[in-house]
């Protein structure tokens, strides 16, 4: 079961991807997590990625594609995987399709978590992220047990630069220009499914599960 999660930044696709991965015992492959690990470790890739992410811009294809392809080739992906944050552009999608075709495979589903822009801005302004492990929280619906401290590792949680309202607006503009065309791309391939991302998270997940098990 090979799944791509689509949707604007802050639509909740990462949360849903993790739940899918847990339920079906397949890896959750998040480019965001990979980038944050590189940023934390101060790698050259991390420094380059951070410069783009802090501006609300997309990390260029060449910094992303090979990394994801190598991850997909690992043994734990042989029964499937959930891609979260990749592909983000038509060239990335075409590269992924070509790479999978070479090994006689293709994606099974592209699931679009659909949320209006206004909801996204409001939602992300109350999001907090752990500086150490990348865990995300919502100060209303998913607060930390101790304010400002990550439940998972005990490190500080902050409003990330790329979650600030002015950056979110820019990220949404970039999304509509570069990433939303993927909706049409996967619709043409016949694998696009859409769910209403404004619903409670458990209802969104129930809708996704119904699609995967139909």
What are these regions (language model features)?
Residues 1-214:
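Glycine-rich phosphate-binding loop of ATP-dependent small-molecule kinases
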């Amino acid at each position: 079961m090979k799944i791509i999660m689509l949707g604007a930044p802050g639509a909740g696709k990462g949360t849903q991807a993790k739940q899918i991965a847990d339920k079906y015992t397949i890896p959750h492959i998040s480019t965001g997590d990979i980038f944050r690990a590189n940023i934390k470790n101060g790698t050259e890739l991390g420094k380059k990625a951070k410069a783009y992410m802090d501006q609300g811009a997309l990390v260029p294809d060449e910094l992303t594609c090979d990394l994801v392809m190598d991850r997909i080739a690992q043994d734990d992906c042989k029964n499937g995987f959930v891609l979260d944050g990749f592909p983000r552009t038509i060239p990335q999608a075409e590269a992924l399709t070509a790479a999978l075709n070479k090994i006689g495979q293709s994606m099974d589903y592209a699931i679009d978590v659909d949320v209006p822009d206004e909801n996204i801005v409001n939602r992300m302004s109350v999001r907090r992220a752990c500086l150490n492990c990348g865990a995300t929280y919502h100060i209303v619906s998913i607060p930390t047990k101790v304010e400002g401290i990550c439940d998972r590792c005990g490190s500080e949680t902050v409003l990330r630069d790329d979650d600030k309202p002015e950056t979110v607006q820019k990220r949404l503009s970039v999304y509509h220009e570069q990433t939303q065309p993927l909706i049409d791309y996967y619709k043409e391939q016949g694998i696009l499914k859409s769910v209403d991302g404004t619903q409670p998270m458990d209802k969104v997940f129930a809708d996704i599960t119904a699609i995967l098990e139909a």
